[in-house]
Amino acid sequence: MSPQTETKASVGFKAGVKDYKLTYYTPDYETKDTDILAAFRVTPQPGVPPEEAGAAVRAESSTGTWTTVWTDGLTSLDRYKGRCYHIEPVAGEENQYIAYVAYPLDLFEEGSVTNMFTSIVGNVFGFKALRALRLEGLRIPPAYSKTFQGPPHGIQVERDKLNKYGRPLLGCTIKPKLGLSAKNYGRAVYECLRGGLDFTKDDENVNSQPFMRWRDRFVFCAEAIDKAQAETGEIKGHYLNATAGTCEEMIKRAVFARELGVPIVMHDYLTGGFTANTSLAHYCRDNGLLLHIHRAMHAVIDRQKNHGIHFRVLAKALRMSGGDHIHAGTVVGKLEGERGITLGFVDLLRDDFIEKDRSRGIYFTQDWVSLPGVLPVASGGIHVWHMPALTEIFGDDSVLQFGGGTLGHPWGNAPGAVANRVALEACVQARNEGGDLAREGNEIIREASKWSPELAAACEVWKEIKFEFQAMDTL
């Protein structure tokens, strides 16, 4: 009989209920390099100590249940249990705490974002002892991140495929998002691409509806891409949304896109699910397709600052599951995004190594050990006057996506695309020559518009458009 077995036998089994904190709150624990670390914003119910609330979260997401069970004696709980190792109050908030938790790596299936989230957030958010709970951050150890393929290609490979360097990429979502026939949809794509955009895009809910079946849309968009490439000499693409009701149908659509010779497909990764997304990412790497990711449904999960999952966690999960682009807010447009927080998760998407920085919402140092990076996509309510700020905020490794800011041009889609391309090139040139985009941005756009009637018309249309609301998600 092993010493471990003898110890368990000597303790014996005592039925009943005991406080979680007696087992799962371990303030003396020293985290291991292989642990997955999590930071939870915990709001306990009145009368519930923060140590008990934090330990309850750990128990339910690892080895615990509501009562003592005799099968606890058949394994080593000390090896497999999650541990709440630190709790700190949230400044300026009453009865709210950040609880830090360490999970042993053996609790998780290799290469499965689905299993990771099922374990960490799958059941605990409904606990009665908690008024609210939010997952604010994760530290993914190299030992776990190396079990994931990650993005199909990554930033450098994408630039090499497109032969485009030294500037952000330009995109446009085709509008109206629903109701166009496939041929008219393809015409809109062609006009935008020939005007100077790098990409056009299906919107998130364009799948295969009665007014435009997916196969027809794919064919007409491929024709538009080929024609625009022939006219401009540039490589072009359209994000063909492969999201479908089943994984099999999704892959079938991706296969058809590859057969048409297009460079990129798209997936709604939250509504489609992480298992489907990872499957599509693997197919895209094996078959040379780039993968654009839309985050439809994210605000249901991340909008409330006290409950849910912060988008920085969803962004990390996407980098693991796989995607070459992902929408990341704009800071300046119609969709919410506070600058420091947004740039925090943009770095988590693009960089190899990111230092802990609570001022930007980064709770843990993250080492991706060369997992390919993801291009952040700025999209939502942006137009030519935003171009200097977007270029300064997001830098070259980004996609700036103008939907209404292209298609709403008074002269049509192609002039709208020209206006955006001229504005971008002017901002990049000014920056490269030492200009200050933050201070001189409006003047740079005005000067460029003297030489571009398309840009001048766009400047006139959108000169008064602003989206000035207080961001809900603050540190």
From Swiss-Prot:
Pfam family of this protein, just one? RuBisCO_large_N
Gene3D superfamilies from the UniProt entry: Ribulose bisphosphate carboxylase, large subunit, C-terminal domain, RuBisCO large subunit, N-terminal domain
**Residues annotated as catalytic:** K175, H294
Propeptide stretches are 1-2
Q: What is its EC number?
A: 4.1.1.39
The site annotation (Transition state stabilizer) covers K334
Question: Is Metal-binding tagged as a keyword?
Answer: yes
Give the residue spans that cross the bilayer: none
What is the free-text note on the cofactor?
A: Binds 1 Mg(2+) ion per subunit.
Sorted keywords for this record are: Acetylation, Calvin cycle, Carbon dioxide fixation, Chloroplast, Disulfide bond, Lyase, Magnesium, Metal-binding, Methylation, Monooxygenase, Oxidoreductase, Photorespiration, Photosynthesis, Plastid
PTM-bearing positions, type N6-carboxylysine: K201
Signal sequence extent: none
Requisite cofactors: Mg(2+)
Residues that bind Mg(2+): K201, D203, E204
Q: Which residues are recorded with the post-translational modification N-acetylproline? A: P3
Question: Its GO CC terms?
Answer: chloroplast
Residues annotated as binding substrate: N123, T173, K177, R295, H327, S379
Single GO molecular-function term? magnesium ion binding
Subcellular location(s) of the protein: Plastid, Chloroplast
Positions where N6,N6,N6-trimethyllysine occurs in the chain:
K14
Could you say which protein family the record assigns here? Belongs to the RuBisCO large chain family. Type I subfamily.
Record function comment:
RuBisCO catalyzes two reactions: the carboxylation of D-ribulose 1,5-bisphosphate, the primary event in carbon dioxide fixation, as well as the oxidative fragmentation of the pentose substrate in the photorespiration process. Both reactions occur simultaneously and in competition at the same active site.
Subunit text: Heterohexadecamer of 8 large chains and 8 small chains; disulfide-linked. The disulfide link is formed within the large subunit homodimers.
Recorded protein name is Ribulose bisphosphate carboxylase large chain
Instruction: Specify the species.
Output: Notothixos subaureus (Golden mistletoe)
